[in-house]
UniProtKB/Swiss-Prot annotation:
The keyword Repeat does not apply. The lineage of its organism: Eukaryota, Viridiplantae, Streptophyta, Embryophyta, Tracheophyta. The magnesium chelatase complex is a heterotrimer consisting of subunits CHLI, CHLD and CHLH. Interacts with CHLI1 and CHLH. InterPro entries: AAA+_ATPase, BchD/ChlD_VWA, ChlI/MoxR_AAA_lid, Mg_chelatase_ATPase-dsu, Mg_chelatse_chII-like_cat_dom, P-loop_NTPase, VWF_A, vWFA_dom_sf. It catalyses: protoporphyrin IX + Mg(2+) + ATP + H2O = Mg-protoporphyrin IX + ADP + phosphate + 3 H(+). Residues 1-49 form a transit peptide. Residues 56-76, 397-453 are annotated as: Disordered. Residues 558-754 form the VWFA domain. GO terms for biological process: chlorophyll biosynthetic process; photosynthesis. It comes from Arabidopsis thaliana. Over-expression of CHLD has no impact on abscisic acid sensitivity. This is Magnesium-chelatase subunit ChlD, chloroplastic.
Amino acid sequence: MAMTPVASSSPVSTCRLFRCNLLPDLLPKPLFLSLPKRNRIASCRFTVRASANATVESPNGVPASTSDTDTETDTTSYGRQFFPLAAVVGQEGIKTALLLGAVDREIGGIAISGRRGTAKTVMARGLHEILPPIEVVVGSISNADPACPDEWEDDLDERIEYNADNTIKTEIVKSPFIQIPLGVTEDRLIGSVDVEESVKRGTTVFQPGLLAEAHRGVLYVDEINLLDEGISNLLLNVLTDGVNIVEREGISFRHPCKPLLIATYNPEEGAVREHLLDRVAINLSADLPMSFEDRVAAVGIATQFQERCNEVFRMVNEETETAKTQIILAREYLKDVKISREQLKYLVLEAVRGGVQGHRAELYAARVAKCLAAIEGREKVTIDDLRKAVELVILPRSSLDETPPEQQNQPPPPPPPPQNSESGEEENEEEQEEEEEDESNEENENEQQQDQIPEEFIFDAEGGLVDEKLLFFAQQAQKRRGKAGRAKNVIFSEDRGRYIKPMLPKGPVKRLAVDATLRAAAPYQKLRREKDISGTRKVFVEKTDMRAKRMARKAGALVIFVVDASGSMALNRMQNAKGAALKLLAESYTSRDQVSIIPFRGDAAEVLLPPSRSIAMARNRLERLPCGGGSPLAHGLTTAVRVGLNAEKSGDVGRIMIVAITDGRANITLKRSTDPESIAPDAPRPTSKELKDEILEVAGKIYKAGMSLLVIDTENKFVSTGFAKEIARVAQGKYYYLPNASDAVISATTRDALSDLKNS
């Protein structure tokens, strides 16, 4: 491509020329925005264009328009300009998923993961600009659809306004786009009492939350992996049910809530719980590699948008308007799309081959396939629709590293060919003709059904991928998975932490929730003023109105080192444990982790360093390192459990991990350690089996107490008995054989195990 020479040597003019001449050729046309030439959508495009270009107003009062003239917005206009979705380079899979969500808001939601700067938020906000406006009932708090009176919120029938021709008064508004902030409270999310209106009317008045505003629009959650666990569970429960039922503070109210959920997150800042991702239909990654040309085009179009956004709007105006029309028509055609039973069997078999748990994947995949057909203006699902649905829904949920079930449903074998016999010549000719016609009809039907199902599966019978090009995509999806829950990483209390929600007090109120207290008292202000004789008080709050604050704070972990201080290698083990403890304390300032050291020697164990986060205290306590004597391993583990339980009661510890640095050999019973006077001097020495059974019993109690055990075996491999590994097995903990481990190795091993524990 030749560039026109520039007379001026100014770098600004050179950049402008490069941008205007080169970028339109480098910027690929988005595949998902190209309409098929042959279907009903193309013929109806101009009919619906008028509806897509209507000037509307959002529920928040912000004027918005989707007309052609509005795309040429002056760069000096006040307000934020959102990057158009059609101008995003690459990410065709994510843009296709967003278009599917725009067609069917109840598709199940879309989750986009990716590192910083991968256009996750840009694409989510860009979708809002191509959504067509919606018609709502005037006075509705949840964008009620006039065509669906069964889904209206409570009391809307009493607030309906009518036109002169006795029809319900409606208005056209822009599809809402509601973002959930990370610090959102429960009352702001689901709704609460409107204090001002309740005081005026003398009765409880409901104030809608963000879920009511998002109905029939887009509900966007940025950094969903950092959202409070209780809020995320509440959010997904409401979206799954499609209705928000509020029963609190004297309120009994319900309203529909069926928005399109779009969630984005950065896996480097924390994984998302697998349970949460399973309830989202499409999970895609924005970290897929881009070609050099695409990266150049992306930087160029972003630079052009920052300087002259109106040029970018004009450049993608046709694609944007086409997408708006495509969404409107596809919503109508979706009602007529059918998917056959054989196609459902194909989706189920793909899910079984991929090792997908549950049935949500098949349900979501069937809905995605129907949306793909509706976008193309078809009434039947095709092979391409099925394969695309598997790639978008089932593939990210697959477990490629797991062994699939031994017995899987296989397609039925083809019927055997008819056999010729001499007796056939004696049959009636009419019957033969009828049978031949029936067979030909069945063959035609079978051929038609086979044409609607892919000939090859994406997953083979052993659970592997047939197409190696999809392997990277599946691996990216598996990296995004988190664990089942992280409830113990947060501590709830009434005195310290971040205010998350109000609650009825249990005893004396430590922290008064003023907002919730006023909401509870608001409906009774009018009645209480009438009973007040003095007339001097402005606000009347009684004891029954009191609400306490429910606080939450980050929970630290407690690492308890149980060190064998007996034998000739005791000093080395104690020195390594001391170094590992100091290293962990130096790194635990932000994580609030605590460290404790319990050496066991002689006849009993002692708490040399109680749970602490102070490095100075640890240095002072660990100056004296006692060594030598017997090996009371059972008492050392029992003491660690007692220290852990006491730390849990203090309310500062969420997770507890016991790190046992030992060779697994013990020669002192627990009874001798706890009550030495009860043992007679001439009592026989305990057998090895008795000592081992006692230690294994303590290991089982560690697991039942909810604590994690990490065993670092220091036994010489030439005389190893393997009992240390048995201890870890009974406690369902981790085992490492590190006979000559340094403090750095022990601290690194403990840190990795602690990280896995926090994410479990």
